[in-house]
UniProtKB/Swiss-Prot annotation:
Cofactor(s) named in the record: [4Fe-4S] cluster
Function text: Converts 2C-methyl-D-erythritol 2,4-cyclodiphosphate (ME-2,4cPP) into 1-hydroxy-2-methyl-2-(E)-butenyl 4-diphosphate.
Cofactor note: Binds 1 [4Fe-4S] cluster.
Record's protein name: 4-hydroxy-3-methylbut-2-en-1-yl diphosphate synthase (flavodoxin) 1
Protein species of origin: Streptomyces coelicolor (strain ATCC BAA-471 / A3(2) / M145)
PANTHER family per the UniProt record, alphabetical: 4-HYDROXY-3-METHYLBUT-2-EN-1-YL DIPHOSPHATE SYNTHASE, 4-HYDROXY-3-METHYLBUT-2-EN-1-YL DIPHOSPHATE SYNTHASE (FERREDOXIN), CHLOROPLASTIC
Keyword Oxidoreductase: yes
Catalytic activity: (2E)-4-hydroxy-3-methylbut-2-enyl diphosphate + oxidized [flavodoxin] + H2O + 2 H(+) = 2-C-methyl-D-erythritol 2,4-cyclic diphosphate + reduced [flavodoxin]
HAMAP family given in the database record: IspG
Keywords in alphabetical order: 4Fe-4S, Iron, Iron-sulfur, Isoprene biosynthesis, Metal-binding, Oxidoreductase
Name of the gene encoding the protein in the UniProt record: ispG1
């Protein structure tokens, strides 16, 4: 009997960059900024006035790992639904307000954890800041100043000609200064654009000129594939420089998919402890097994596993054994069979038809032992 240490860290490894120093605000129980972990959020796609459907979608988002959720509030019926939704939601609810300032006050009174305001389209917003600041301060409600390229203040469009990085940053800082005049600084800021290059530069300028926590987002990023690429590029560029305190991946998909992508981005940058990670080769003429099918079946079989486990699925003898040895669990396939590795040690060889079943069984065994040993221990698997 041999005990093989798994080598799985109990804490995240060093992140890609030192975090930008920023203020900390509380969005309900979730800290944002001030060195708090980067949080992942999304937005419901239901009519907020449909309380049951909205709470159901929030429950699905919560189960997927969402930490903060935003709900639209374009009508009085939506505003009337906010108290129940804010009270029954498992995670903090942010009301998203455009056009009508009265809904800002309704959201604050409803007990929402925060309110997003769009200074570019709320009627007479500058004149309402004093009242909004007082109401938010009285209720302890943070405000997100959400500047968006598609609804930029006309004064700035006239000045810059289009939604440039300078225009986005100036808009946000101007509105923040109005709140500051009324001694309100419980603020976070976003400056979103659908072009990742413009968006990245806008956030860089903003980060250099203020210490407010920043909400990262590429607006109208597009369908799943395109939106994922845009968000990964933009967030990676900023988070790798320590810029960003909470993220929302905008996709034209069910919102749960946004959370999956957001979590993967943070894990890839070591800003969150990694969960299950499948490493698989892209396949080539050397492959002696259907790598695509194998990787998909292993991924499906381990879906929902939360332990930090790296599983390598390799299709040939060139890189297969080396990659499998580097993983916590892996298979190197060839000649109709697969060598199963646990932390660099070959524990068994199985027929090709048994590879998926064996990998899933071994992963479950490792996960069970990790849970038994506790998150802070140094788990090991015993093989004979």
């Amino acid at each position: 009997m041999t005990a093989i240490p798994l080598g799985l860290p109990g804490v995240p490894v060093r992140p890609i960059a030192e975090r930008r120093v920023s203020r900390r605000i509380q969005v309900g129980p979730v800290a944002v900024g001030g060195g708090a972990p980067v949080s992942v959020q999304s937005m419901t796609t239901t009519r907020t006035s449909d309380i049951g459907a909205t709470l159901q979608q929030i429950a699905e988002l919560t189960a997927s790992g969402c930490q903060i959720v935003r709900v639209a509030c374009p009508t009085q019926d939506d505003a009337d639904a906010l108290p129940v939704i804010a009270r029954k939601s498992q995670i903090p609810v942010i009301a998203d307000i455009h056009f009508q300032p009265k809904y800002v006050f309704a959201a604050i009174e409803a007990g929402c954890a925060a309110v997003r305001v769009n200074p570019g389209n709320i009627k007479q917003f500058d004149d309402k800041v004093k009242e909004i600041a007082k109401a938010a301060k009285d209720h302890g409600t943070p405000i997100r100043i959400g500047v968006n390229a598609g609804s930029l203040d006309r004064r700035l469009l006239q000045k810059y000609g289009r939604a440039t990085p300078e225009a986005l940053a100036e808009s946000a800082l101007w509105e923040a200064s109005l709140f500051e005049e009324h001694d309100f600084r419980d603020i976070k800021i976003s400056v979103k654009h659908n072009d990742p290059v413009v968006m990245v530069e806008a956030y860089r300028q903003l980060a250099a000129q203020c210490d407010y926590p920043l909400h990262l987002g590429v607006t109208e990023a597009g369908p799943a594939f395109q939106g994922t690429i845009k968000s990964a590029v933009a967030f990676g560029a900023l988070l790798s420089q320590g810029i960003g305190d909470t993220i929302r991946v905008s996709l034209s998909t069910p919102p749960v998919e946004e959370i999956k992508v957001g979590i993967q981005i943070l894990e890839s940058l070591n800003l969150r402890q990694r969960g299950l990670e499948i490493v698989s080769c892209p396949s080539c003429g050397r492959a002696q097994v259907d790598v695509y099918k194998l990787a998909e079946e292993v991924t499906a079989g381990l879906e929902g596993m939360e332990v930090p486990l790296r599983v390598a699925v390799m299709g040939c003898v060139v890189n297969g054994p080396g990659e499998a040895r580097e993983a916590d669990l892996g298979v190197a396939s060839g000649n109709g069979k697969g060598q199963i590795f646990v932390k660099g040690e070959v524990v068994k060889t199985v027929p090709e038809s048994k590879i998926v079943e064996t990998l899933i069984e071994e992963a479950m065994r490792i996960a069970e032992q990790m849970e038994k040993d506790g998150a802070s221990g140094a788990p090991a698997v015993t093989v004979s």
